[in-house]
Amino acid sequence: MNAIILISVLGILSMMSEFIGLKKLIYPIILISLIGILGYNACTFWNNPETHYGMLVHNNYSVAFGSLLITITLFWFILFRSSYSSGEFNQGDHYALILFSTVGGLVLVSFSNMSMLFLGVEILSIPLYILAGSRKKDLHSVESSIKYFILGSFATGIMLLGIALIYGATGSFDFATIEKTASADPLFFIGITLLSIAFAFKVSAVPFHFWVPDVYSGAPTFITAFMSTFVKVAAFGAFYLMLDSIFESVPTYLSHTLIGLSALTIVVGNIAASYQDNVKRMLAFSGVSQAGYMLMVFPILTISAKTSLFVYLAGYAIANLIAIYIVQVVEKSKGDARVENFSGLGKSNPFLAFVLSLSLISLAGIPPAAGFFGKFYLFTEVIHAGNIYLVLIAILGSLISVYYYFKTIIAMYSGEEVSTLTNPAFGFTSVILAIMSALVVLIGLFPDILLQIGMNI
């Protein structure tokens, strides 16, 4: 609750920074504040659970996922600061919108009432509708914003209808009451299904993924980085929290639906990604396939399943942020992110090539990176639940992903150098990239810390 209030105040301060003479100071203020808020939030992990006005709950789950979301926001601010150096974008307004979106994400992982679920989704999404189209003279960016807004509004309508039906069946917006009064009323199950469809849109599960490639490729790359990491973590955290708050075990019909969605998302996402020759668009479809892996544990409402989801999301978010940052560097230098523009990067900038390779290896699930352990732990949980065929599909999908991830890696190290990058990573940014890359390896080699956190949420 305190983190939500503090980041909200920080967003308002950023929005007013030009008027109160803090334009040059707002960036360090945001960084220092986020570090302080992250530290404060993490220190409350072992506190007793608290409910605020029956709307928000402060417990280990909200603290763990909230800390992960704040960490993603902090890394985003550090990595993509250079995006505002040209003066094309209003720095204070953009920073404020990102912070407000962060508030929405924190609400989504701590709600205990359906009204707060809806508010969290809207607070998260509305700033991103604006940011996706912030490159006003670029028709692709404008198209991205319009598509995201229209389809996002459609998903919101489905969510509202689901909430209304659940309220009609149970007479309450409170999840604790819904859990006690849930019955065989068809309205209740239709409502849950509609809510699940709305979340499937937010996490880009097939067949609700059709907006992803156009929105991600059309939006400014630094906004794509935020959407593909922060939004995905917040949406998955909220989706699992909703199911865990209502059911002791997922109903059979919903379990089979989620398994089918997971398998379809893995297959379609990986096959579509393998046909892309633009790395940014490839990462968009890769994000779709990654959503399929995460959905595998949703029919399993156990502590270990929750832990595997948390660990996987942490590794995915860090690796994806690194990859998209380097895509932006190449885009600025070469004009776009086609695979051939990465040719020879291993010779012209070995550091960038190495960290990009490491992030792609992690996304592919190859040891010793975080992605390998995340997939291993996740697959193990699904096998224990008896869904062996789903794991076989996931393994096949992972094998397909090796092809398109390594297509970029091979181009970097075996291709002829096209030209030297005009905007290579340097200074503080390179230090942060090194730290994030180290985290990708350390999570893979020493996952015990994240496992301990996960087992207590």
Swiss-Prot record:
Catalysed reaction equations from the record: a quinone + NADH + 5 H(+)(in) = a quinol + NAD(+) + 4 H(+)(out)
Bilayer topology: Multi-pass membrane protein
Alphabetic keyword roster: Cell inner membrane, Cell membrane, Membrane, NAD, Quinone, Translocase, Transmembrane, Transmembrane helix, Transport
Record localization: Cell inner membrane
Keyword Cell cycle annotated: no
Transmembrane segments annotated in the record for this chain: 2-22, 25-45, 60-80, 92-112, 114-134, 149-169, 188-208, 222-242, 253-273, 283-303, 310-330, 353-373, 382-402, 431-451
GO annotation, cellular component aspect: plasma membrane
Main location: membrane
UniProt GO MF annotations: NADH dehydrogenase (ubiquinone) activity; NADH:ubiquinone reductase (non-electrogenic) activity; quinone binding
Gene Ontology BP annotations: ATP synthesis coupled electron transport
Enzyme Commission code(s) on record: 7.1.1.-
Superkingdom of source: Bacteria
Protein role: NDH-1 shuttles electrons from NADH, via FMN and iron-sulfur (Fe-S) centers, to quinones in the respiratory chain. The immediate electron acceptor for the enzyme in this species is believed to be a menaquinone. Couples the redox reaction to proton translocation (for every two electrons transferred, four hydrogen ions are translocated across the cytoplasmic membrane), and thus conserves the redox energy in a proton gradient.
PANTHER family, per database record: NADH DEHYDROGENASE (PTHR22773)
Assembly with partners or alone: NDH-1 is composed of 14 different subunits. Subunits NuoA, H, J, K, L, M, N constitute the membrane sector of the complex.
Family of this protein: Belongs to the complex I subunit 2 family.
Name of the protein this chain belongs to: NADH-quinone oxidoreductase subunit N
Organism from which the protein derives: Cytophaga hutchinsonii (strain ATCC 33406 / DSM 1761 / CIP 103989 / NBRC 15051 / NCIMB 9469 / D465)
